[in-house]
From Swiss-Prot:
Keywords: Acyltransferase, Flavonoid biosynthesis, Transferase
Entry's family note: Belongs to the thiolase-like superfamily. Chalcone/stilbene synthases family.
Protein name: Chalcone synthase 17
InterPro entries (alphabetical): Chalcone/stilbene_synt_C, Chalcone/stilbene_synt_N, Chalcone/stilbene_synthase_AS, Polyketide_synthase_type-III, Thiolase-like
Species of the source: Phaseolus vulgaris
Gene for this chain: CHS17
Annotated metabolic or biological route of this protein: Secondary metabolite biosynthesis; flavonoid biosynthesis
Keyword presence, Acyltransferase: yes
PROSITE patterns, alphabetized: CHALCONE_SYNTH (PS00441)
EC number: 2.3.1.74
Molecular function per GO: naringenin-chalcone synthase activity
Reaction(s) the record says it catalyses: (E)-4-coumaroyl-CoA + 3 malonyl-CoA + 3 H(+) = 2',4,4',6'-tetrahydroxychalcone + 3 CO2 + 4 CoA
The protein's role, per its UniProt record: The primary product of this enzyme is 4,2',4',6'-tetrahydroxychalcone (also termed naringenin-chalcone or chalcone) which can under specific conditions spontaneously isomerize into naringenin.
Active site: residue positions: C164
């Protein structure tokens, strides 16, 4: 007779969850940030709001973003004028777009990750899909399973409406799945399309305007598994430790509400302050067990909610400017793609590390941190261990 403890022992993997491949994708429509205010105020029939346009121009100039990618183009917006108004009923039109395009963009990223992984997709045992762009039943996880031709009995997890901390959430869940199911290979996909949040300007809702200056579309996919097969699977980063916490005294700091007008969001001015005030505690809990207190000695992947958050975190911790380079590069080239951002940054970091001939996937360093920040205010922390190149 086999005992339950023996069954549990046999079910568990031996090594830590490991990222085995990364893929990213964006829509083909690229938007230049320097000319975006002209386009945005024209397409939303708001050119008469000259003072607000100047304010929006300053927001775009200070955003540290050079370009973004958006599924919504002029043709689509002209066909859906209610999406261009500030608060017109438009949820049906938005939903019609995202329920199709979110899984499609996710598929593009997933195909790249599966190709890099080099294993047949039939070996994928679990699927985690995450999006804040629309909701549907069956969900985007089901649609992606069909689009990719995954096995019908793949174990699916659909995470809707998590917001910008979700890149950390999906890695935390993938780690638990990979380490507790021997031989599991988890496909993780974050896909975001701003069709749910795009709307015209209002001088009474400036936090909405901040979002119009920052948000972009993108999808990222990773494959996570423990005990990589030697010579066949190539590890990139090990997921060593994870945590999630709600920052104290942060109620209402970041809110999103799905309404007839689409997804509205509200930001308190002091979001960067709340993040920087709580980051030290999160780092201490993560790295004190490793006897690491010099946060310039680790590599950094932080959700680029906006330049002010990164600036205040750097200042609070005394980080060298190069620590946030990969993070700032992704913000500059793609904007804020919500949960997908940190996975884009992982991809950027391992590529640049290889190009520069560094010793590890983590800029030549051994240990690193990945942070997600989002509604709550919620902070996700992931301790990463890099792999020798």
């Amino acid at each position: 007779m086999v005992s339950v403890s023996e069954i549990r022992q046999a079910q568990r993997a031996e090594g830590p969850a490991t990222i085995l491949a990364i893929g990213t994708a964006t829509p083909s429509n690229c938007v230049d940030q320097s000319t975006y205010p002209d386009y945005y105020f024209r397409i939303t029939n708001s050119e008469h709001m000259t003072d607000l346009k100047e304010k929006f121009q300053r927001m775009c100039d200070k955003s540290m973003i050079k370009k973004r990618y958006m599924h919504l183009n002029e043709e689509i917006l002209k066909e859906n004028p209610n999406m261009c108004a500030y608060m017109a009923p438009s949820l049906d039109a938005r939903q019609d777009i995202v329920v199709v395009e979110v899984p499609k963009l996710g598929k593009e990223a997933a195909v790249k990750a599966i190709k890099e992984w080099g294993q047949p997709k039939s070996k994928i045992t679990h699927l985690i899909f995450c999006t804040t762009s629309g909701v549907d039943m069956p969900g985007a996880d089901y649609q992606l399973t069909k689009l990719l031709g995954l096995r019908p009995y793949v174990k699916r997890y659909m995470m809707y409406q998590q917001g910008c901390f979700a890149g950390g959430t999906v890695l935390r869940l993938a780690k638990d799945l990979a380490e507790n199911n021997k031989g599991a290979r988890v496909l993780v996909v974050c896909s975001e399309i701003t069709a749910v949040t795009f709307r015209g300007p209002s001088d009474t809702h400036l936090d909405s305007l901040v979002g119009q200056a920052l948000f972009g579309d993108g999808a990222a996919a990773v494959i996570v598994g423990s005990d990589p097969i030697p010579q066949i699977e190539k590890p990139l980063f090990e997921l060593v430790w994870t945590a999630q916490t709600i920052a104290p005294d942060s109620d209402g700091a970041i809110d999103g509400h799905l309404r007839e007008v689409g997804l509205t969001f509200h930001l308190l001015k002091d979001v960067p302050g709340i993040v920087s005030k709580n980051i030290g505690k999160a780092l201490f809990e993560a790295f004190n067990p490793l006897n690491i207190s010099d946060y310039n000695s680790i590599f950094w992947i932080a959700h680029p909610g906006g330049p002010a958050i990164l600036d205040q975190v750097e200042q609070k911790l005394g980080l060298k400017p190069e620590k946030m380079k990969a993070t700032r590069d992704v913000l500059s080239d793609y904007g804020n793609m919500s949960g997908a951002c940190v996975l884009f940054i992982l991809d950027e970091m391992r590529r640049k590390s290889a190009e520069k001939g560094l010793k590890t996937t983590g800029e030549g360093l051994e240990w690193g941190v990945l942070f997600g920040f989002g509604p709550g205010l919620t902070i996700e922390t992931v301790v990463l261990h890099s792999v020798a190149i």
